[in-house]
Amino acid sequence: MRALFSAITLLVLPWSHAATQAAEPVALPAVVIYAPSPCLACIDWADHLRQNGFTVTMEEKLQADMPKIKRWLNVPSALESVHTAKVGRYFLEGHVPAQDVLLLLQEKPIARGLAVPGLPRGAPGRESYNPICDTACTILDNGGQAKDIRREAFNTMLVGPDGRTSVYARH
């Protein structure tokens, strides 16, 4: 009986170890967000990333320093938003959904990064109206004319190594 138990253990043990290995979560690279202070929508986007498993650090920058950061990370000027982030070897510009970032890290395309240009309402961090934030954020958002929340369709753009863009995800 003891021999039978040992034989079964030897057969099952490698499989149980493999199952345990597969169940272990993969560590995500940390996200560093560079944002002007105060930007409540940027803070909400950071919370969205945290809720999806990312470790996030926010570095408050002067508005005047943001263009230098965007140039350093090779963000095309036509795709700029308020905040800029770095995850692994990629930049994230604007309110990029966490599921797009996760897919980027899984697929590992040869690219500079992802961008959601402007400030589309309904994007992560832009789900609700905040009059305090809109004072700064509406520069790119129709001057804050609409107080009611409206969800806007938006695309996440993949920026290739040469700066060319393609639609990575539609929301």
Question: PLM features: residue spans?
Answer:
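Local sequence-structure signature of Cys/Sec-based thiol-disulfide redox active-site neighborhoods
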Residues: 24-52
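Thiol/selenol-based redox catalytic cores and closely related redox-interacting motifs
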Residues: 70-171
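Bacterial N-terminal signal peptides
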Residues: 2-16
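Ser/Thr- (and often Asn-) enriched beta-sheet segments in non-cytosolic proteins
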Residues: 32, 55-57, 155
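N-terminal, post-signal-peptide region of Sec/Tat-exported proteins
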Residues: 41-89
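Boundary at the C-terminal end of the N-terminal hydrophobic targeting segment
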Residues: 16-25
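Active-site-proximal beta-strand/loop segments in catalytic clefts of secreted hydrolases
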Residues: 34-36, 59-61, 95, 117-119
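Loop/turn elements at helix/coil->beta-strand transitions in domains of secreted/extracellular proteins
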Residues: 28-30, 54-55, 80, 110-112
